[in-house]
Amino acid sequence: MMDKRPERDFTAKVCQPIWMEGEARNGKKHGVLLLHGFTGTIAHLRPVADALHKQGFTVMGPNLPGHGTTMDEMAACTWQDWLEAAKAAFIKLQKCCDDVSVAGLSMGGCLALLLAEQMHPTAIAPVSAPMGTRLPLWLATLTRPIFPTIWWKTRDGQMRPVMNEYDYGYPGFRNKCGWQLSRIIKMSRRNLHAVTCPVLVVQSHADETITADSADVILRGVSSGRKGVLWLQDAPHVCTITDEAERIAAAIGEHFRWAETHRE
């Protein structure tokens, strides 16, 4: 039987898709596509979006298919749906901006890596991007009859607190979605060598969701001439809604501006 716990209400303004027009620098505009994570919403990237917009970037942040609605709607979506939505948003930004860079949180970071391979952005910044997870996703098919829904654990109280006004996402996911996430992780990891644009990885030493070597796997795998990492100390997986948000946005903005002026 499907668990019918109450679902979240996603009508809050912070959950709505982001579009903020930026300023031209030397006659050119730089667009930033923000991609949220698995079961999350664009609200998780709202503080970073606001900070990047203040830096002059045009910022776009969609809610990926099946997110910000119901867990059952999400269960009807595939990893291809999420990748195609990310591509469509990227193309929309390309039509009005001279440069387009991508920053993604968690699964959104994996999508950023796939876009780097296929769409050739100016730069990317994967944040808390999993190259492996602490969840046994490979068990999804076997355990589905017993556990049709997987519920997220309560955050560790030892970590930095999150800003609750931006913490909008599903409390869990239908088990069948686990395979879709594992597929995106596998696809993004398989062709890291095809990523040549500048890469800034953001990861917390305290991340409770992804494998600790994820940042190292990305940095070793990509072929980028410029690549680096911003390490956070005690931030949770969704670090973009903690008091580290400004620091993250500052580092990402500086990274994107560097790429803008050094693009071949």
Predicted features and spans:
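Short alpha-helix in the alpha/beta-hydrolase fold that links the catalytic acid
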Residues: V48, C197, T211-R220, W231
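Catalytic histidine neighborhood in serine/cysteine hydrolases
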Residues: D216, R220-V238, A245
